[in-house]
Amino acid sequence: FNNIYFEFDKTEITPKAATIIDEIAQIMLTDTSKKYLITGCTDAKGSSQYNMELSQKRADAVVNALIKKGVPNKMLKAKGVGAKISYASQNAPNEIREGDRKIIVQIVTNMDYWNYIP
């Protein structure tokens, strides 16, 4: 499936992202014993605190959308990391920084790690 991206300073799921979330939900529902960490990211613009909050809201928005598609809540955890893994500088053009405003979907197989994630 394609990547889920967000518009600058937004947490709303775009129509394109909604289509991708549909695809992800279908994949997740094939094996409900798996666990997924949904990580929200931001670009480098803005304060660290603001970006942490924004990235958490983005991750929460995707988790909520997946739950609405029937994915059990017990399969999902959301974590925001702000701009910790952004690659483009805050002065880069918006078209480049867009690549940092993303969601990372990770299968978690280590249950000790899963239980450690808040």
What are these regions (language model features)?
Residues 12-13:
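Short, glycine-rich nucleotide/cofactor-binding loops
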Residues 22-29:
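Short amphipathic alpha-helices and their capping/turn segments at secondary-structure boundaries
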Residues 30-33, 41-43:
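Short connector loops/turns at beta-strand edges and beta->alpha or beta->beta junctions
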